[in-house]
Design a protein with these regions (language model features):
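Membrane-embedded alpha-helical bundles of multi-pass transporters/translocases
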Residues: 2-471
Length: 471
């Protein structure tokens, strides 16, 4: 067995920094894919793919393709996790996957927005579908091993909160750069580029930055120096059955499924809320998102301390409650009198709390559940637990992605793709999903999980001290 080294701050930084790239790519896909390919009249973007409810009479093309992408992603999650958990690569079970997936992960995110023809048609439809699906496959190949590596390297629950805080910080700052897309697009348009080239130039810059950051862990982290793993010997189906037999895992996964679906509704529609519902220009979204991001970053130290002191469950429940209220405000308060920009900025400040909580603590909560299982079974199955959770949550997200585009067309005027009533309904449905998450997290017995982790940790520390005395 290898002598395990202490994980240094430099290694933690190398592990966390790819989240900046993931934040960039997530902003591209979650915030702008629907806006780019199902354009409103305010955007000036030409129509490039088939519009309307063309699949089964209820689904839009983009909604269907993205939903299928999430299903592909969900199905490949346990397959990749199983391969990673059982890998015998001399460089480790996780890092080699990340190394080879990094470049195609970034390139596929860019190529989604580079449909070759300037008008809707079969060629563009096929192009967009293939690269959306490729993006989700390479996302899985990179992120499942990446997520599984953390519980193996960091076993202290309080230190793990710190690492997830840094993880979230990089993700949020990457997302923040993604959120300034309208400003960068405007700058490129002012420089003489047409609207499509302006969007693509912006995303090309993001892609170059993202790929470089994705490759850093592969260069800097020598996995075998920080992890001693016991490979599982059971089959994929047995591993999945074992994961879902854990009651703590079931409740946490259900809560994250519902909360993540609610967030998908919000992210997919934020540009529409700003431009079509509030009547503000595209560039206003930059200021609004900046306020929510800066507000959430200011709350990070408080949330981190709260999570260490009282556990992750209470802050997450309150974060979901506040986010539910925010969604209901969008639905029922959109037509309230008052300056639109003032209302938008007020909402941005309000959602900064759930943004902070739901970016930091859910991952750390799941890592606790995974460690609990490892301590009770003696086998490291971090990959399959991450994949099982991802499988369920992505199926839920797929449902959301199918629903959102179909809802947004409700009440649309003739010749337009977006209706005010449909946007209000998306906010209402998103709020109901988040309310369901509150109930699921209430059912999770965090105290039982943490009690075992602390008990085993104290026992391990006592054993280590006894060895020192004996020597």
């Amino acid at each position: 067995m290898n002598q395990i080294q202490k994980v240094s701050k430099k290694i933690i930084l190398a592990y966390c920094i790819p989240q900046f790239a993931v934040g960039l790519f997530t902003a591209m896909i979650s915030n702008y894919l629907l806006y780019f390919y199902q354009p409103s009249k305010e955007s000036g973007i030409p129509t490039l793919v088939t519009q309307g409810v063309v699949v089964l009479g209820i689904l839009t093309f983009i909604g269907f393709v993205k939903a299928v992408g999430h299903v592909i992603d969900a199905v490949t999650d346990p397959l990749v996790a199983n391969l990673s958990d059982k890998s015998r690569n001399k460089k480790g079970r996780r890092i080699p996957f990340m190394k080879y997936a990094a470049i195609p992960f970034g390139l596929s995110a860019l190529l989604i927005f580079c449909a070759p023809q300037g008008r809707p048609g079969l060629v563009n439809n096929i192009w967009v579908a293939l690269f959306i699906w490729a993006y989700f496959i390479f996302y899985t190949l990179y992120m499942i091993p990446h997520n599984a590596l953390l519980p193996e390297m960091i076993t202290d629950t309080k230190e793990r909160v710190n690492v997830y805080t840094f993880n979230s910080l990089f993700f949020v700052t990457g997302s923040a750069l993604g959120y300034v897309t309208p400003a960068l697009v405007g700058m490129f348009k002012n420089a003489g580029l047409d609207v499509l080239l302006a969007w693509r130039a912006t995303f090309a810059i993001f892609t170059v930055v993202g790929i470089i950051l994705l490759l850093l862990p592969a260069v800097m982290i020598k996995e075998r120096e920080y992890v001693n793993s016991v490979r599982p010997t059971v089959s994929l189906m047995q591993s999945l059955k074992h994961a879902f037999s854990n009651k703590h895992f079931r409740w946490v996964t259900l809560g994250q499924l519902l909360e993540g679906t609610a967030m998908s509704f919000f992210q997919s529609c934020i540009m529409y809320y700003v431009t079509s519902l509030m009547g503000l220009p595209e560039t206003a979204s930059v200021a609004i998102l900046a306020i929510s991001i800066v507000g959430s970053l200011c709350l990070y130290p408080l949330i981190s301390k709260w999570g260490k002191k009282s556990g992750k469950r209470k802050p997450i429940i309150w974060g979901c409650v506040v986010f539910t209220i925010a969604e209901f405000i969008i639905c029922f308060g959109a037509d309230m009198p008052g300056p639109a920009m003032v209302k938008a900025c007020g909402l941005a400040i309000f959602v900064s709390f759930p943004f902070a909580v739901l970016n930091i603590l859910p991952g750390s909560m799941m890592a606790d559940v995974i460690q609990y299982d490892t301590l009770t079974t003696g086998i490291n199955q971090e990959g399959i637990f991450s994949a099982a959770r991802s499988f369920i949550t992505k199926l839920g997200t797929s449902l959301a992605i199918m629903i959102v585009p179909s809802l947004t067309v409700i009440g649309a005027a003739a010749g337009e793709n977006i209706g005010r009533m449909g946007l209000k309904i998306t906010a209402l449905v998103g709020g109901l999903f988040c309310l369901g998450a509150v109930i699921a997290f209430i059912m999770y017995r965090e105290e039982e999980v943490l009690a075992l982790i602390h008990k085993k940790g104290e026992g391990a520390n006592a054993g280590a001290e006894k060895k020192k005395v004996t020597k």
